[in-house]
């Protein structure tokens, strides 16, 4: 059920125009895990990391990196409390492991608008924000959008 909900959200395409393509960082905090890093769990190799992790204290505010519409909210086994934001033209952000969600389904959020607070819900080893960006259902490195991409 969780995977099906999230897949539908990633496949959503709205005609709205993205408000900006250079995004703001959604949270202040150091990068703790980059995009694409190969992961291991109990000695087993897993899929590469599909987003950026930012270390931050529990309760740190999370801001919308660009304007968007809340298209999915959930509390999932792996991702914990999660918000999906549709920026338009197939560009979707996912914010995971929140301690609090401060938006509702269908809300229009301005760039810099408050989404929720950093937490460690779901499968997390400590408080952090996992931020994932998808373009037409393909995961892309969010660092590209915040001017921090390093090939």
Predicted region positions:
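Polar/charged, compositionally biased leader and regulatory segments
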Residues: 1-38
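Catalytic cores of peptidoglycan-degrading enzymes
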Residues: 24-151
């Amino acid at each position: 059920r969780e995977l099906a909900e999230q897949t539908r959200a990633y496949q959503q395409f709205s005609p709205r125009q993205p408000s900006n393509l250079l995004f703001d960082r959604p949270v202040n905090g150091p990068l703790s895990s980059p995009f694409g890093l190969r992961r291991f769990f109990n000695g087993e190799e897993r899929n590469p990391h599909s987003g950026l992790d930012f270390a931050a204290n529990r309760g740190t505010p999370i801001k919308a990196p660009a304007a968007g519409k809340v298209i999915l909210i959930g509390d999932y086994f792996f991702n914990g409390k999660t918000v999906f934001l549709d920026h338009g033209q197939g560009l979707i952000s996912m914010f995971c492991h929140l301690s609090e969600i401060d938006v509702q389904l269908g809300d229009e959020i301005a760039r810099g608008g408050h989404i929720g607070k950093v937490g460690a819900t779901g499968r997390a080893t400590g408080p952090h924000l996992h931020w994932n960006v998808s373009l037409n259902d393909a995961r892309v490195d969010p660092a590209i959008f915040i001017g921090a991409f390093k090939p």
